[in-house]
Amino acid sequence: MNSTKKNLCGALVFAALCVSLTGCPEEKHPAAAAQPAVASPAPATATAAPAAAPAASTPESRPAPAASTATQPATAAAAATPPAPPPPPPVMGFDDAVAKATHAVFTNAPPPEANAGMVVIDPLVDGMSGYQSKATQTIQDRITHIVKEEFPKYAVQSISPENLKKNPRVLVGTFTPVNAEMKTAGVRESYRFCLVMGDLSTGKIIAKSVARARIAEVDPTPAAVFNDSPVWTADPSIQAYIATCQASKVGDAIKSEYLDGLLAAALVSEAGDAYQQGQYREALDLYTTALKAPAGEQLRVYNGRYLSLVQLKRDEQVTAFRDLVDYGFRRNRLAVMFTFRPGSVRFATTNKLSSSYGMWLEQIASEAVAKKSCLQITGHTSPTGTAALNDNLSLLRAEYIQSRLEEDQPGLKKRTLAAGVGSKENIVGTGRDDASDELDRRVELKPIEACP
């Protein structure tokens, strides 16, 4: 049985991201796997290649030119065999992992020229959900402290439109729960920390490091605006951010998709800080400005605008939520955060946005009818409880959402399909059953071509 955020059994809509790190096998991000319409790096799983035979790999045993041609194919094949990937980094304490990655990046990066040591941190994210959390915020604070104390040639600054004009170096990082095989599946046992430094003046990746932290020492509670966000979908801007860290190596060009959205990212960072501090009018202005910036049409911008309007008690919140739904349908995947009573198919009333659930359902139903969409409604749960119980509960909750949508728009009858997958498609997978893995307890709506 699942529990919700704040000890409730919650079914929530959400989404996630794919990660692969230097020194680790590449992995497929759930968003990429289930979202063919959204471009993302092609995933692959690396396997260790068999070691070459000594006769083919050492000068002493290499065949002479006059040797029989029968040995040449084997020799050529051995020479073409790629080396086995290095072992994963050891698991260590949270602070030690952050220090290890930070020291490696700043030590290995080419020294900055005089008066050119500015480095900005593009806020780190969870490598699956794309959310910022207490853990990622703590990492940023630790990086800032370490650089100030030990790398005086650098000056860490906040990411802002003004600072970006100076073409500084930029830090990008992901913090991802993984299992014993370093994969984002099954029981998560540690957090994998990827940290990359890019040089905006050259457009190149100049340093990278990977470390692992013990899962028990990590606080993955989402930051305020992410904790409150009602909707998740596969977002190209966040996928580009994650790929910049996970799918890169030193010397690579920084991905253009990431660079195109940097101005919007700076505005979103400032807006998130304002929201966290309760400055909702300023947050609304910044999110609205970000929406008009290049590559500014992002889920976190739409979420931020909606939440700021809710906090300001403005009537425009209904239109803002409709924009969220439209964005999700255009991405072909919409996850909405509904909190249910423990073991029940009825909504809980403790969530501060629960009073808006009726409006959410009305807008989702209206958009589906307007777009003449058929919908697949899929319930999800965290891994807590038996598989059979989770499968049944996730289906019942999907069917409840289905019935509510059809009540609001009778035209949706015979155009929706309900399904439950239990915990088989977890995004976070930590099993904490709190706000940090709320995305695993989601109800997901996806437009489908053929009606049931």
Where are the predicted features?
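C-terminal/domain-edge helix-coil "capping" segments
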Residues: 21-71, 79-115, 199-292, 297
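Short, solvent-exposed beta-strand/turn patches at coil↔beta or beta↔helix junctions
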Residues: 82-96, 329-363, 382-388
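Periplasmic peptidoglycan-binding/anchoring modules of Gram-negative envelope and division proteins
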Residues: 94-113, 345-378, 406-407, 445-452
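A short, hydrophobic beta-strand-centered structural micro-motif
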Residues: 104-105, 118-124, 149, 154-198, ...
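Periplasmic OmpA-like peptidoglycan-binding domain that tethers envelope proteins to the cell wall
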Residues: 130-137, 143-145, 350-352, 380-452
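Conserved small-residue packing positions in alpha-helical repeats and bundles
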Residues: 271, 305-306
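Single-residue signature of alpha-solenoid repeat helices
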Residues: 283, 317-318
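Alpha-solenoid helical repeat scaffolds
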Residues: 288, 322-323
